[in-house]
Design a protein with these regions (language model features):
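Short glycine-centered segments of the SAM/dcSAM-binding site in methyltransferase folds
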Residues: 33, 122-123
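Conserved Class I S-adenosyl-L-methionine
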Residues: 43, 161-257
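Conserved catalytic/acceptor-binding region of the Class I
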Residues: 108, 115, 123-196
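Short catalytic micro-motifs in class I SAM-dependent methyltransferases
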Residues: 99-100
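Conserved class I S-adenosyl-L-methionine
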Residues: 1-32, 43-47, 66-69
């Protein structure tokens, strides 16, 4: 996928609020190694490096465009690397991931895989968007179905009616308990975003949800796709104000030891 960091940061404050809450959930702990999985442009990775100045802090992301912005955030204990979360190597005392794991399937298996990279006594801290059932996403899937030929049948979750990999807080807690985790906290929180009509909501989705679709379409088909999606959004939100109740799931867990 081709990410646009400038587009993503057009709603910087709304996107940063859940990350700050996740940071606040991380308990005090000695850290030698910290990793930020799906670090994007690296602002939160830098915050981790400042909070744990004696630790080696790694920001990992698959997007060259995002990491190009991150390279400017120099600190002696901070480095960035391009790579896939599923190819993670090494062991860590803190594994942090803000709004990234929702792009990966099978979260019970994913958490088990990440858990193997967490040192005893270490903490896993994760935030994922949980708005897959929001009307805006359903309308996006409808638009993808309309463009099935151009997209080769692709939709965000694999099939036209595929389920999101994101779980409920209770299910995440159960999975973590099954891994032997202690001190588990898992919660859901709504972060309201007020947007200027359907056009504002389209601008919001351009930073995230639209990315995998537009990455698969040429310029002309991409413009047609956006126009068809915007028409659906305007039909649902004809006014000049959209109240977007953005739900997020946040959880932390400590590995005994």
């Amino acid at each position: 996928m081709t990410w646009n960091p400038d587009q993503y940061h057009r709603h910087r404050e709304a996107r940063n609020a859940p990350a700050r809450d996740l940071m606040a959930m991380i308990p005090a702990l000695p850290c030698r190694d910290v990793v930020d999985l799906g670090c994007g442009t690296g602002e939160h990775t830098r915050t981790l490096a400042e909070r744990f100045p004696d630790a080696r802090v790694l920001g990992l992301d698959s997007s060259a465009q995002m990491l190009a912005k991150a390279d400017a955030l120099g600190l002696p204990n901070l480095r960035f690397e391009r790579g896939d979360i599923l190819d993670l190597a090494g062991e860590y005392d803190l594994m942090f991931s803000n709004a990234a794991l929702q792009w990966l399937p099978d979260h019970p298996a994913l958490l088990a895989r990440l858990w193997d990279h967490l040192r005893p006594g270490g903490v896993l801290a994760v935030q994922v968007p949980a708005n897959h059932d929001h009307v805006s996403h359903r309308l996006l899937t409808e638009t993808a179905n309309e463009f099935a030929a151009e997209l080769g049948g692709f939709t965000r979750f694999g099939t036209a009616h595929g389920a999101s990999p994101v779980l409920t807080p209770a299910r995440y807690a159960e999975v973590l308990d099954g891994l032997g985790a202690g001190e588990v906290t898992a919660l859901s929180k709504v972060y309201p975003v007020v947007l200027p009509g359907a056009g504002g909501l389209l601008d919001w989705t351009r930073g995230t949800a639209l990315v995998p679709y537009l990455s698969r379409l040429g310029a002309e088909d991409g413009e047609r796709f956006v126009a068809a999606y915007l028409e659906r959004l305007r039909s649902r939100w004809p006014g000049e104000r959209v109240y977007y109740a953005f739900t997020r799931v946040l959880f932390t867990a400590r590995k005994p030891g």
